[in-house]
Swiss-Prot record:
Species this chain originates from: Calliphora vomitoria (Blue bottle fly)
UniProt keyword annotations, A-Z: Amidation, Neuropeptide, Secreted
Residues modified to Phenylalanine amide: 10
GO annotation terms (biological process): neuropeptide signaling pathway
Secreted in keyword set: yes
Protein name: CalliFMRFamide-12
Domain of life assignment: Eukaryota
Keyword Signal applies: no
Family designation: Belongs to the FARP (FMRFamide related peptide) family.
GO CC annotation, single: extracellular region
Compartments, as annotated in UniProt: Secreted
Main location: secreted
Length: 10
């Protein structure tokens, strides 16, 4: 989940 959230922040 953390990786997906980071991608969305980009």
């Amino acid at each position: 989940a953390a990786g997906q959230d980071n991608f969305m922040r980009f």
